[in-house]
Amino acid sequence: MVRLALVGLGKMGLSHLSIVRAHPEVNLVGVCDPSKFMLELLGKNAGLETFTDLETMIERARPEAIIVATPSRFHGEIVRVALERGIHVFCEKPFCLDWKESTDLSELAERKGLVNQVGYHYRFVAAFQEVKRLLEANAIGTVTHVLAEAYGPVVLRAAGSSWRTQKAEGGGCLYDYAAHPINLLNWYFGMPARVGGTVIKKIFSRDTDDEVYGTVFFEDGPSAQISVNWSDESYRKMSVKLSITGTAGRIIADRQECKVYLRDGTQSATGYSKGWNVRYTTDLTEAVWFYVRGEEYSLQIDYFVKAIASGSTENVNSFAAAAQTDQLMSMMRDDAQAVVSAPVASPASEQRRRPLFGRLAEGRAVGHDAKLAFWR
């Protein structure tokens, strides 16, 4: 049994709480949160050991591992405390708001030999795992371009104060929504060489962003367009979709299915034939012992627990992988600011801005010689 503690009792924290309590190989030894109301509720009705202070919980509960589900700006400090005490860490996404801190913590976890994982759950969605398998099998040949999208109805009006509406807390469409398709791009293609044309816009939010658009360029690899909007009421809930074009076919994947088009039947994608093929997530997903929000949430926690039990520090969602995503988001934010602050080109001269027929009329006014000179 893995002795595990949980830090943070927001929406994701409560989701993780329900999963780990049902896990047959986990002993939940403590929960930590500043909300005394939530702690009293859980202590009285669930019989859990509750704490308002992280250091006290570590000292008394002696966890082998912790799940960090606090607002993003607290991640770095909490993760560092845990790692320095030899505790394995699962941290919610985004990992850190400063990618340099993400990289530093990744290196610390590696030096300590500790299991480290970040909650990018789309890497545990069967359809996106199938995309990974197909790309590694070179099923669609050389990938030339990707469209990575995410849409949903998170902010549909001017909102009150919460972490989602505050840039300093890690709120905003870029870090909360765009992080997911960006993380998938990192998983499939690594770290891009550069970004360009990034647009980060507000629709309803005052302090942070509601739309993110831009292009990333992978060295000796594809280009990828990112299109994300969390103020889109046409979607009932969050939707992430990737459309991948290659020299020998195409892949379109979301949480529900993986559609594959192959130009011929000679590719190495086992089980796929020429033309369109569809694999549904329900056919690709393994059964889980406990379901909440989606199988991928249980699968990622089970993966973390099994890594601890086996002593393996290799992880599909490691701190190092998440640091790439943090860095790419930082590159896009810097690019968007550079575009906004770029100087505006000087207006054309009066002569060049004058319409063609205006110049012809001027030629007629000054005489036949001027008109001939114009046409020469």
Residue ranges and their predicted role:
Residues 30, 64-65, 145:
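Short, Asp-centered acidic motifs that coordinate Mg2+ and/or phosphate
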Residues 65-68, 289-291, 299-376:
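C-terminal helix-rich "cap/oligomerization" subdomain common to oxidoreductases
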Residues 1-45, 372-373:
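N-terminal Rossmann-like dinucleotide-binding module
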Residues 104-122, 141-146:
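Rossmann-fold dehydrogenase core element
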Residues 16, 48-108:
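Beta-loop-alpha module in the N-terminal Rossmann-like domain of NAD(P)-dependent dehydrogenases
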Residues 204-207, 222-299, 315, 372-376:
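NAD(P)-dinucleotide binding in Rossmann-like oxidoreductases
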